[in-house]
Every structure is written in structure tokens, then in C-alpha cells.
Amino acid sequence: MWAQLLLGMLALSPAIAEELPNYLVTLPARLNFPSVQKVCLDLSPGYSDVKFTVTLETKDKTQKLLEYSGLKKRHLHCISFLVPPPAGGTEEVATIRVSGVGNNISFEEKKKVLIQRQGNGTFVQTDKPLYTPGQQVYFRIVTMDSNFVPVNDKYSMVELQDPNSNRIAQWLEVVPEQGIVDLSFQLAPEAMLGTYTVAVAEGKTFGTFSVEEYVLPKFKVEVVEPKELSTVQESFLVKICCRYTYGKPMLGAVQVSVCQKANTYWYREVEREQLPDKCRNLSGQTDKTGCFSAPVDMATFDLIGYAYSHQINIVATVVEEGTGVEANATQNIYISPQMGSMTFEDTSNFYHPNFPFSGKIRVRGHDDSFLKNHLVFLVIYGTNGTFNQTLVTDNNGLAPFTLETSGWNGTDVSLEGKFQMEDLVYNPEQVPRYYQNAYLHLRPFYSTTRSFLGIHRLNGPLKCGQPQEVLVDYYIDPADASPDQEISFSYYLIGKGSLVMEGQKHLNSKKKGLKASFSLSLTFTSRLAPDPSLVIYAIFPSGGVVADKIQFSVEMCFDNQVSLGFSPSQQLPGAEVELQLQAAPGSLCALRAVDESVLLLRPDRELSNRSVYGMFPFWYGHYPYQVAEYDQCPVSGPWDFPQPLIDPMPQGHSSQRSIIWRPSFSEGTDLFSFFRDVGLKILSNAKIKKPVDCSHRSPEYSTAMGAGGGHPEAFESSTPLHQAEDSQVRQYFPETWLWDLFPIGNSGKEAVHVTVPDAITEWKAMSFCTSQSRGFGLSPTVGLTAFKPFFVDLTLPYSVVRGESFRLTATIFNYLKDCIRVQTDLAKSHEYQLESWADSQTSSCLCADDAKTHHWNITAVKLGHINFTISTKILDSNEPCGGQKGFVPQKGRSDTLIKPVLVKPEGVLVEKTHSSLLCPKGKVASESVSLELPVDIVPDSTKAYVTVLGDIMGTALQNLDGLVQMPSGCGEQNMVLFAPIIYVLQYLEKAGLLTEEIRSRAVGFLEIGYQKELMYKHSNGSYSAFGERDGNGNTWLTAFVTKCFGQAQKFIFIDPKNIQDALKWMAGNQLPSGCYANVGNLLHTAMKGGVDDEVSLTAYVTAALLEMGKDVDDPMVSQGLRCLKNSATSTTNLYTQALLAYIFSLAGEMDIRNILLKQLDQQAIISGESIYWSQKPTPSSNASPWSEPAAVDVELTAYALLAQLTKPSLTQKEIAKATSIVAWLAKQHNAYGGFSSTQDTVVALQALAKYATTAYMPSEEINLVVKSTENFQRTFNIQSVNRLVFQQDTLPNVPGMYTLEASGQGCVYVQTVLRYNILPPTNMKTFSLSVEIGKARCEQPTSPRSLTLTIHTSYVGSRSSSNMAIVEVKMLSGFSPMEGTNQLLLQQPLVKKVEFGTDTLNIYLDELIKNTQTYTFTISQSVLVTNLKPATIKVYDYYLPDEQATIQYSDPCE
């Protein structure tokens, strides 16, 4: 290399530049607060008598960073400083100023830097990613700064939210222990299923976990091959492997589907048929290694066309031999048309003119393997023409090259590595096969010298904490320095935008000669990882500059190095093992060890180095935009404005070779750009920057580089098993084994003896540690295998229904080297029944590495968790086994296993809610609640609980997305998820309770609701229940949507055109009388029938216009009021009277309002301290303590309340009256904060929010005592700080009498919820309902089967038809609808939509009429369950859910 360099230098003509003293000041462009940063001053000898000052000027003060006088030799001086806080709190643009005074010199220079408050990172770690109801949740919270040092600041609040966003627990003023918060929470046995959230720092940081009903998998299925595919291949091997969690291979049946899916867009046109997927199905058995392999011909698939997806979907299902338990694995593999690829390696994006440019080209085949002895055509594109070189790769697929640059004339040059010189022929009808060539664009490095500096690259990722030698080559031109002059090479090591390390190498050119090398020893730490940069430069006495820059790849490491291990790494269940922990002295270590089975269910939730680094998304390229430095060109042109820092990509670019147009700033080819690229500001009078070239630039080519991946290392322990005592009983099966905090002493080591749980599995353990001096550290995950060579295992479902039979499977495993004879016993119990207790004992012969399965048909007779005890032992028998007497080991001859199953009650769940609003006002306010049960209750199925909130809107606030427990698949039902959020937000905003967390969550729901509602919009601007599927838009729903969109504009973006289009459509349907015509199906029941139909509809539309902010003078409003005045005082319909009273209150027509309110008062029902209205009053003798209101009664009472509250000011008498109405409405709440249907929920929540804003007195401090006559007592404390916390406790005595006693100041909202199961009722007053089940094949009761259901239903009530109706079909255990059911049902009469949830099929009907409607579909059995209990079919009126009919259906084979 040096010979070529010297040949290049002989061509240069010497020219000695005038010796000018120079300086160079560097510091980070982004100064994070709080942090310690460095500023460096590099001075030449010419400044020996000059005093330099560097200052940082902010809005608040001027801070002197450095004051220094030059020396007689070149010297680099750096000093650390504390970054001041930014003015304004978040960020501030400050000025860095350097000045020099002395020796007849006076100058100064300044630049901008950004001071930015750095955010901390917080993570939440749970002991497991998912839980079952009733389990304990453990979680930790850690906050650290960007240097991974733990922060010990107090958390003002940590809250836990359930899937409905109920705040079910909170912890206030939480103080970490050495940066770690360790908390726990007990889930209720009836805990809601779904995703729970741990919210920290006012909701800015979240951790989540799931609550599900699951059974831990015992084995893992993996698609081992293929990992990648290419169109070049003729075939590929599919390999599926399955192993138990303790590492042994599993035997079972394998089904593999290898499919190429058809592209949906390809057959979207109506005239095209849907293309079938191209599939190959494979089946077989796993071998002794637990694997199954089979070849697949690539000719099966479409490799060149566009009609099919260019990826293969592999779905593998493995069924365990003997148990029938199955597990799945899915893999999508891209079929690459790429036949090979080339990449440049060990190259820069610039070259030094007249010095040889060297690099390498890596060549890979279609499978990413290195291609050896392969031709490479290197093409050089320059201003002087195009030149070619032919290279050959070595055994590593590398082709090195060296190019002479003297002929490039200091211009841009592009290099391309090609597989072949001829271009491939492109066929637009086919996916082209191609070679990925290598591209590299080179710019000349700007320098006024003929000297050279080059840094050798290091292959990464590099290890932290280990010294790395970096070799630097240089050549010094004689013109740049005389032989007796000392040359100083300055270097900076930059990580995460901070100057971490700096130094100088002083060399004497006389001693070193023209060319030489030196090395730097660098040690990388977490402050530098993962992508540090090194900049080296020299400024010669002549003024010339040489420089080079390199970026390293460093592992994501931490300064606190943590390791964890078990000794031995394999141990018997129930035996002791030593846990060995190592970390920095004084660390506090948080340990976690969980069953690998849990991680198989959720493998992506683990804490890792990458996830911790990901909390600090460090910014590397260029300067922050606030302090960017652009080159300004004097001429106007396409770049005559400040340019962005990111390269804009023109549309229609090719993904293989993309053209990037650059703005006019220097591009990485001078010392200035080196510093800019690593985020350092530089102030200097040296020639460090290339002059600006404002001429038009040619497009350049950009190439992306890929990164390789590693393979996990296999580890096997040869440590012998320690023997535990014989006849072990295994019944301790935690999913989390270890969850503890361990302090580390001065030795940096800790050893703890722990007992291995009873599960045969692998335990995955990890630990993180915190230290104030060494920061955060995270250990690799290690495993401990709990294993014994002879054991029994039980296969159980998560839950069963009492009375249903299920199959209990026991599998005995023999991993001894000999055959054994075993006896297996299932213990008797009164909690379950066996078909024949004589079959509870079995014996069999079991040879090495074999397994034997035994089955029993079990019927559970007791609710709750019941235990199954299975015992197996090795018999000392003379009966031959494997051709000889069975082997009997000295120890480990028996194994006993105890495992539970949850038994659930049969029947239909009924939920009753009693709500109470207690306002003690200085004296005790009390109420009695009687938990009474019906006679037809399912035995032992009762549960009851009480919930307490300090705010009347609290339950609704916590359940914004679940106010009504009904399907929500049409345009109006979607609005019940939308409208109440607006009212809740309005209330919270006025009450000063609207936190950023609540706003963020609520706005998210609004944005989703807005998007969904637009699906139901017609092209004319109107809306209907099912959108364009309906013939016309609907007047009522359009008014409802328009009102809500108008009110939501304050919180989210609503396109004004959507509102204007709807208003225009409604205006077109306003009659000359001012009334509104009923267009489309009128969904709302209360507006149907008789003369009041037009009046109530007009009232609703006019109210909607007024509520969205329209003035009474608006033509649509004024004409609507004119229509309503004609019948305002003459209407006798109670609902219409309440609605009109509200309308005229909004319009300010107080005379008419008062007349209507008097009419309402005459029909008000007063019950104790409550006031309400009902269209069908119920005699008081039949009054129920439970919430069972008619939806229309809730709605008209809510309108009456809105009318009472809508006036400029309220008297105390009016507030008292409103409170009495609220007392009744509050009692009608369901357990989720809503009411029975949609419109009653919307209007009632609107009224309650208005009351809460106007007249409600929230709790200051209240003690609520809940007690029973059976000596149960629980006290709840409610204050302003926990006003919105959802407090709950179980009520143990059912049936029973409970008393609620509230004392203190304010109001408290209490709900008592009673849940029990009953056998389905057969009431047919409003709907007829029957079902026929087609003939089923019952010959093979152990095989899955299909059932055809034919449902007959009609409306038999007092009206001509029902409102929208839902047919709700519950699935039999183990059954689900066959594929295509949705499309089949949508073709049947009146069906508007079909939805399938976990175990329920909902069929939406436009209405039901007197004529019987018939619906037929098929359900198929996917899980075999015997002795099936019946399932239910229910039909109900969506808007009058009390109108319903329910029947049962059964499997005819049972």
C-alpha cells in the first residue's frame, strides 16, 4: 500500500503554504440537561501569548466554559462543564462564543447550540406476561437517565387499570429502593379477561399484562426449515421439530400446510373469480429427535406472476401421541427473486485525491452464502469515462481491489460491483429475477494539503470493557512540515452525541519519516455504545488539514456487568440448587425465574439490552434542526431555501437503485462535515470546510447495507443429578419461581440456596441490577432444567362445566436406560365421578425413552378448583418387560402428581346491579340492600361484590369503551361509544379533573369512533345503521351523528365537510311546516307510532342543532321551533313532552318550557327521595331493588333532568329536585357505567354530566361502611385524591342483608352487584323462537362432527314489527361456526351484519315482523368434549332488551 502511496505523491508539485496560526474549538451541538459535557480547544504554537475564552450564552446567564493561554507547541485542552437548564423548561437555543485577545490579535467567533432537557427512561417489568384470574401480579418499575444511572425520584402515583380502563388500584408517593419499585396486586377470582395496564408518571409510561384463561403448553413446535426461499431453487425441505419444555423430543402426529396465498387485489374486479391458494399439505410422525421433514417442489407455486403473494405461509400442527394435545407454529417466508447480492465493505464514501482507494466487494448467493472463486465486474463511472476491472472472490466471498485516483481529477466517482455486464431482460408481466449489485458513490476529500490519513476498520460488534487497538496510517508531505517540526494528531471519540474521550499523538516527522502508522488503544463503554465514532485530524504548520472518520459497531452493554447462573444447571424437582449472582459491589439485584411454558405463550415481552437502549432513541446524523448550519447559495434555484437534514425521496423511486437529490451543503468530504456528522459544533479559522459549490449536482446513487445475525449457542450440562428422597409428591407448580431483590456485598458476588419447584420443565432466569456508581446492568437469560428420568404428567383443560364429562389423560415417561413395569393409580374423590372406579388403577410395561398414556372419563360434581391426584410407581415384578424382568432403580421409583381444574357452573349468567348515591352532608346517610336469590338459581353459582367511587361519573369514565354490554356493529351503536366520551370530557374539563392521560385515552376512542362512523356514511352526506347497505340515509341517525361530530371538534379533528354535507341533507328533508320528514328506517322506538312521530323527530333534530352550537336564528332551527310550537302544549306523549321541555329550554323559550315542566311534574313518580317518569308505571309493590328500568323511561327521565338544568341559574329548590332525579338515574346504572341500551345511555350520561358540572358535590372525605347481619364489615375511605379509584370487595353472605353507611362531607357512589346462574327462561311474549338440528353422524363419538342449525323466529308483540333485533347464538363447548358462515347468513332475509366473538355468534336483523324468518348455518366441533351441556339461542330487541326470547339446543348425539 505504501509503495502505491509514494508513487502517487511523486506526481505532486510542492507548494509551501504560508504558515498561519489556527485554533479549533469543539463541543456537542446538543447539550443535554442535566449532564456534564466537554469543550475542547486545540491551539497552534502561534497563539502562545493569546488568551482564549469560550463562553456559553443563554437567556438567563453567560457561563465561562474555558479560559486558556496558548503554549509554544500545539496543545489540546479540554474541560468539563455542567450544562445549565434551558429557559422555558424544555429546550433553548444558546450561543457558544470563542474570543482571542493578545499579541496584537483580537477576534471572536460564535455559533448556535441547543440545550435540551433530557428525558428519563422508565420500564415496567411484570413477573409474567399473562395471568389467570385469582393470581398475584408482581411488577417492578425502574427509571434511569440516558447514562443508565437509576433515578430515585418519588413517583406521585402508580395506577393499575383493567381492560375497561377502570383504575382498580393506585399507589401514591412511591419511593424507589435504589431505583427499583417492587409492587404486587391480587387479581380477583372473577377478574375481567383482557389487557391490564400499569401507568406511571401521569400515564406517560405504560406496562401491560394480560389476564386469560389458559393451560400452559408442555411443548414447543418450531418451523426449523426453510428460513429463506429463492425463485432459483427447484425444491426446499420443510422441517418441523417439537420438544418438551425440559428439552426432550416429543413424539406426535404432524400436519403441515405449505401455502401461497392469492393476492386479493388481483381478483377484486366483479367479473374475476377468487383465485384458489396454491397449497401442499404434508403429514407424518415425528422421529426420535422430535422432528419431521419432507421435501416440497417449488413448481407447486407461482414464482413469476403477480397474482399470488411472494411468500410461503407454513402452518404446522403437532398432536402429542396419547394425549391429543396440539400446538401450532406459523412461519411466513419470503420468496426472493434475488439470485445473488454484492456489497462494498471496508470502504468510505470519500477518497483522497492522488492516493489509491482500496476496498472489498462481498459476494453472496441467493441463500446468503459466500460465493468463492466468483467473477466480479467492477465498473468505475467518472467524468473521464467508464472503466472496468474483473475481480475474483476468495474463499470468504471477498474480492479486494485497489484503484488509482490520480486520473479522477478530484471529481465525484461512482463504483458498481456487477454479476454480469449485460442487463437482464425485463418482462412487465412477470416478477423479475435480478442480481443485487453493489453501489458506492465517492466524493473527493477536501484538503489543501497533499498529506494523507487513514483509519483501519474494526469488525464489529465490539465487546465492551476490552481494549481495542485502532491502527492509523499517515503520510506527511514535506511541504506540510519541516523535518524538525512536531506533528500533532488530535482525536475525538464521540458516543450518543457527547464527546467522551479525546487525546493527541505527538510525532516528529524527522524521526517518523514520510509514511508511518500509529495505534490508539480504545475501550468502549455504555456511554459510547452502540455506534460510537472516531474523528482524527492533523492541522499542519502550513495550514493544511488531513482527517479521517470511522464509525464502530459496539454491543449494547452496561457498565454494571451482571451474570447469573445455577449450580448444577440440571436438578431434580424439589431438590436444592445454588443460585450464583454477580454484579458491581453495592448493587441491588432484581431476580426473576419463570417456567419456560409461560414464555412460549408470549415470547416477545422479555426485558433485553435492546429494549432498555430503545428507551433512549439517540440521534446521530448532523445537527439538530434548530441549530443547523446551511450553505447559502447566492443564486436562486430549486434549493434556494433552508434544506432539510433528511434526504427527500422522489416518488416512484426504484427500491434497488434510488436517486437522491441533495441540497447544497458539504457532504461528508471535509473536516467540518466529519464533526457535523457526529454532532459536534466546530469553531475554527483553519481550512476545514470545502468551498460551497452552488452549481447543479448530478443525481447520486444510494445503497443500503444489511447486518448479519448470530446463532444462539447450545449448552449441555454433564453434571449428574442429585437424588432427592423417594416417593416424592409433586404439587407445587408456580409459574413464577423466583421474584426477589438481593443486595450485593463488597465482593460483588452473592450465592443463595433455593428449592426447585415440582414442575418437570426448564426455568428461565434473569436479573437486572442497579448501582448509583455503576448504573444499570442486565444479565443474559439462563436456564435451569428440572428433570427426573421417571415421572407422570397430567393433561387437563383450564376449566370445565359442572356435569360435563371430559377426558383426563395421564402420561408416564421413562427416560431410564432400561425397561420398567409401572402401576398407575388415580385417587378417588367426592369432587368428581369416574365411569368405573375399578378402572382407576392400571399397569403397563415401559421401555427406554418411551411413554405410555392412560385415559379416564371424568364428570366434575363440585364447583371451584378440584384436585386430581395421580400416582405411578415402578413394580418389582417377575412379569417380563422388554424380554426380561423389569428394571427397578434404587431411588426415584415413584412419582405422585396433584393438579387442579376449575369447574364452572352450568346455566346462563344473570347480573343484577343496585346503585346508590349517598350524600351524608354531615350526618350518616344509609341504605339497605337485600341480596335475594330466585328459586330457579343454579346451586353454588352466586357471587356478589360492592364497588365504590367518589364521583358520580367515575364508572362511566373508567368504562368509556364498554358502557353497554351489547353488540356494537352498526352506525348508531358505534355512536354510543362516541357520544358519552364527549360529555365526560366536558365534565372533567370543567371540574378540573382532565389529566393528560385521560385526555389521551379518550381522544383515542373518539378518533377510532370517528373513523368507524364514516363507514356508515352515504354519498349524499347522510348516515344509516349499515351505510350504503341500506337504501336511504336516516334522518334521526344523521342528526345524532352531526351533533356529536360538531361537539367533538373541540377534542379531535373532524372534517367540516362531513358536518356540512349532513346539514345540507337534513335541510333538504325539512318540510314547509318546519317539521322534518322521517327518511329511512327510524331506529328509535320512542319516536315510532301515532301523531307524535313527526313532532318527536323534529324535536330531536332541532335539539341536535342547538346542542352543536347553532343559533335560534338559524333557518333550520327557527323553522323547526315553529313546527314544534304548534303542538308543544297539546301533546300527551310523555316522552315527547320531556324532549320538548328540553328543546325549549335550549332555545330560551322559558314560557313554553315552564308549561311543559308543570305537565311533567303532574306525571312524576316520587319514590322515597327519588323522582322519575315512566310510560308504564309499575305498582310500588312490585318494585325491585335491582336495576331493571325500561330504556325509554331512563331516556325520558334524563330529558326531564336536562330540561330542569338548562337555564341561566338554578335555585336551591331546583338543585334539590334535580338531585332527586339523579338519585333515581344513578340507581339504573349497570355495572359498567352505562344503562340497558344505546340511547338511554347517551342521554342519561349527558344529563348526569351536566348535573355533575352544575350541582354535584363530590366527596371531600367520606367513610363508607358496608356491613351485613352475618358479622361482615368493610370500610372504604374516599377522598379527593382517590375520587376516581375503582374500589371493590367481595360480599361473602349470599343471600343476605347489607347496610351501606356513609359519613363525612360530599357524595359517594356505590354499586352492589349480584351474579348468579339460572337455567334459561322460556318466555315468548314478544318473540317466537325455535331451532331444528339436522341429522348428525353419531357413530363415532370420539371423532369431531358438524351440526346444522335451522333457527325460526318472528315478532309476536303488540307492534307491527320490532326494532333492530339480534339473534345471539351461544356455541356448544368445543364448537364454532364453519368457515363461510358470515357470507351465507348475509344472503338471508333481513340480515344486515354477522359477528362472531369468543363463543357467540351475533346476527343483526333490520327488524323482525309477524312472518316467521328462517336462518340456517353449520357449526363444527374443533375440541372434543363429551356429555355436553345445552347452549342457548336468544333473540331480543336491541332498543328494548327486555323484549326477548331464549331457548336451549343440544348435541343430538349426547
UniProtKB/Swiss-Prot annotation:
- Name the organs or tissues of expression: In the epidermis, expressed predominantly in the granular layer at the apical edge of keratinocytes (at protein level). Also detected in placenta, testis and thymus but not in epithelia of kidney, lung, small intestine or colon.
Organism per entry: Homo sapiens
Q: Which family does it belong to?
A: Belongs to the protease inhibitor I39 (alpha-2-macroglobulin) family.
Cysteine pairs bridged by disulfides in the record: 40-78, 241-291, 259-279, 464-557, 589-769, 819-847, 845-881, 919-1307, 1075-1123, 1338-1453
| Domain of life of the organism encoding this protein | Eukaryota
Database matches in SMART domains: A2M (SM01360), A2M_N_2 (SM01359), A2M_recep (SM01361), Thiol-ester_cl (SM01419)
Give the signal peptide as a residue range, or say none if absent. Answer: 1-17
**Major localization class:** secreted
Underlying gene? A2ML1
What binding partners and quaternary form does the record give? Monomer.
Instruction: Look up the record and give one Gene Ontology term from the biological process aspect.
Output: regulation of endopeptidase activity
List where this protein forms a coiled coil.
none
- Protein name in the entry: Alpha-2-macroglobulin-like protein 1
What does the function comment of this entry state?
Is able to inhibit all four classes of proteinases by a unique 'trapping' mechanism. This protein has a peptide stretch, called the 'bait region' which contains specific cleavage sites for different proteinases. When a proteinase cleaves the bait region, a conformational change is induced in the protein which traps the proteinase. The entrapped enzyme remains active against low molecular weight substrates (activity against high molecular weight substrates is greatly reduced).
Cross-link named Isoglutamyl cysteine thioester (Cys-Gln), sites: 970-973
Q: Glycosylated where?
A: 120, 281, 409, 857, 1020
